[in-house]
Structure formats: C-alpha cells, structure tokens
C-alpha cells in the first residue's frame, strides 16, 4: 500500500493535528493554502531548485566511509554529506524553502526558534539573501553553549532574543517564538525548524528536507545497484531523519533507525529519549510523543547536543514508531563523544554532536548486520560549532591523548 500521510486534517494516524489558539488558526490555514499553491507553481519550484543547486551546493555527495566501515567491522557505511551544505548542516534545505514561501505570501519579516543555532543561522542566512527582517528566539542556556552561532546570526543581520523562561532551552524558545508570531501574524512568517508544530509545518519541513533521501536513494542505486538495508539518522525534533526516511517509506526492505539522545542514560532524568520514555501529549500545537510526568507536565530534556534536547518528536515519527515502520534507539553523551572522535580519526570528518549520535549507533548496527549488508547514515551537520565544547569536556575528563 502506498504511504499517504498526513490526512487532510493534518493527522498521521492519531498524531499531528492543529492544536493552536484561534488567533493563530487563520495564519496556519493561510500557510496551508500558500504551501499547496507553491507545490503547483513552476516558477516557485524552479527558483527553489536553482537556489538549492547554486547557493546551497546540492547535490551533496553520498560518501563510502571505507575506514569507518573497517573500524566497525561489518556493514558498508555510506554517509549522506549534509555537513557540506552552505551553513554546514541540513537546516538550510528547509529554511530556504520556507523563507521563499514567506516572500511569495507577501510577508517581510521572519522569526524562528533555534537550539544548537544551526536553524537560526540558516534562517538568518535565507533572510539576508531575500532582504527580510529576521528575529531568532534562543534559550539562554543555548546562547551560552553556542555563542559562536549567536555571533553568526547577528553578523547576518538577525536579532537574537535570549529566552529566560522555563529551562531556557529549545522548547522555551519555541514557546517564545509562537507567542511572538501571534502578536505579528499579519506581516511575519514563523520558520519552524523541525517536523514539529501544528499542521502544515511537519509536512512542509518534511517535504523540504526530503531532498536528502531523494538524492541518497538515487546515488545509492547508482553506486550499489540496489537499495540499502538500513538508514540511520539522529532525531531531536526529527527533520534530518524524516528527510532521509520519507523517500524510502514504501521500500519495505529498507529498515529505518532514528537515534535519540540518551544523555546521561535513559534510567536517569537527564535524557531526551522521547519515543523510549515519552507518551502521547500535546505540545507546540501538535499531538506527538512527549516527555512528561504523571500530571502531564512537560519534563526537561537533556543532551550534550543542543540540537537534540527537545522533549517532543515530530508526529510523523510517533506514527512511524506506532506502526513499526521505523525503530527508535538511543545513544548516550559518552557514546556520542566516542562517535565524534571515531569519525574524526577514521575519515578526517569532524561531525556535529547531533550527527555523532547517528555515527555511534551506526558502528554498533554495522557489527550486528554483518559485512553483506549496507547502510546510509545522515551526516546532518559539521562539528565546527561543537569543537570548543568537546575540547572543554575532554580536557575536564583529561582524555585528550
């Protein structure tokens, strides 16, 4: 049966929907119409395609990681090199699409939330390209962890709002951005950074990120003359993973593994393993798996990686998990740091801490699958933004050899 989600109410099975105040419903409906129109607009599609090619640098390589494969001692590991995009991560695929859409809708301002700062940088980049005013909401904790990205955003002309509410991380930045959108919905588009939020955001972000899997599928077929046995990608909100998974959804032989952040361990309160430890609830306008206590209060998510410490997961991921189309696993901070070092030393590629979770799991999975099998890992971003943090962490552990 061909996969066809979401339904026309924006649900993926029981997940998804539009749980927003009346004040935002008009904006959400307007966005739905504009997005559907843009899909049928050849001028819009041609402009986006040209930007992805000439500005972002697509298509990026599908790279056979020979030494990583030898290190793991099992399945062949291919890396989809989203780290080579302009701005250094997959985030630009979506930011460009949405800012172009905002321009088409006649908006002259964009706002966005950011965790690691990559989506903020990508949105500020796209706003600069189109000459639009840009405001980024970022939790105070993340502002401290990612000061370099804060400077990048300001350099690109964006205003960065440090959010001091709650636990001062990504979920609080989303809250602040949604509040700001309500207040200025007439001339402003909210550039959602992941497959989250009320419909049509999860679908829009998925569709703009699906270029990852579309390219990877064609590239893999060309190299191996068959489909891969497995796909591996890290999952915070879940946009790089959904971008890789979605074009393979009807290929039943291809297994999909979403790698969540186990932080200090899933048996501690300090993790972001939403599928493993969460249950369905409404957050930020959508019904999805959420980390919550017995009273339904949202718990704080924790990860060494600022891009993964979100207490929810995109509704389509919740659906994939519920129907068994994808498996969701977890990797601790320690294992991710090991992945960070392994890829750097075997391939000369320094990955983002987010992507390091996927690398760490891929090494485990490759051993399990054996040398006859193949996999694609989404290298969602480069590690420049994390080098100082990792340096401090490893020096504290006196582990730099």
Swiss-Prot record:
EC class (word): lyase
InterPro entries attached to this UniProt entry: Trp_synth_b_CS (IPR006653), Trp_synth_beta (IPR006654), Trp_synth_beta/beta-like (IPR023026), TrpB-like_PALP (IPR001926), TrpB-like_PALP_sf (IPR036052)
Organism domain of life: Bacteria
CDD domains noted in UniProt: Trp-synth_B
Residues in the signal sequence: none
Pfam families in the record: PALP
Amino-acid biosynthesis keyword on record: yes
Modified residues (N6-(pyridoxal phosphate)lysine): 91
Keyword Translocase: no
Record pathway: Amino-acid biosynthesis; L-tryptophan biosynthesis; L-tryptophan from chorismate: step 5/5
Keyword set, alphabetical order: Amino-acid biosynthesis, Aromatic amino acid biosynthesis, Lyase, Pyridoxal phosphate, Tryptophan biosynthesis
Cofactors required: pyridoxal 5'-phosphate
An annotated Gene Ontology molecular function: tryptophan synthase activity
Assembly information from the UniProt record: Tetramer of two alpha and two beta chains.
UniProt similarity note: Belongs to the TrpB family.
NCBIfam families reported in the protein's UniProt record: trpB
Role played: The beta subunit is responsible for the synthesis of L-tryptophan from indole and L-serine.
HAMAP family reported for this sequence: Trp_synth_beta
Xref: PANTHER family: TRYPTOPHAN SYNTHASE, TRYPTOPHAN SYNTHASE-RELATED
Protein name: Tryptophan synthase beta chain
Organism of provenance: Lactococcus lactis subsp. cremoris (strain MG1363)
Lineage: Bacteria, Bacillati, Bacillota, Bacilli, Lactobacillales
